[in-house]
Amino acid sequence: MENFDKTMKFNYDEIPKEDVKTVLQNVYHTLEERGYNPVNQIVGYLLSGDPAYIPRNNEARNQIRRIDRDDIMEELVSNYLQEKSN
């Protein structure tokens, strides 16, 4: 019988921050090209998880869906705070 009283730790390869940045830049530019307000659309996606906020053009929707929304928010907050501290 297995012991289920211990907390297991799951390790996975984290997505490099550069990949998150590259994807966000691509999504931003795609949204601009399509005539959308990129900030509003990305915020809508992050809050709702609904990929319909991101267009399929330039594979933007597929790219952003590969990254966990928490990782995207972490990257955005980290960059914002780093910029403010300089």
UniProtKB/Swiss-Prot annotation:
Transmembrane segments: none annotated. Pfam families: IreB (PF06135). Belongs to the UPF0297 family. This is UPF0297 protein SSP1144. It comes from Staphylococcus saprophyticus subsp. saprophyticus (strain ATCC 15305 / DSM 20229 / NCIMB 8711 / NCTC 7292 / S-41). The lineage of its organism: Bacteria, Bacillati, Bacillota, Bacilli, Bacillales.
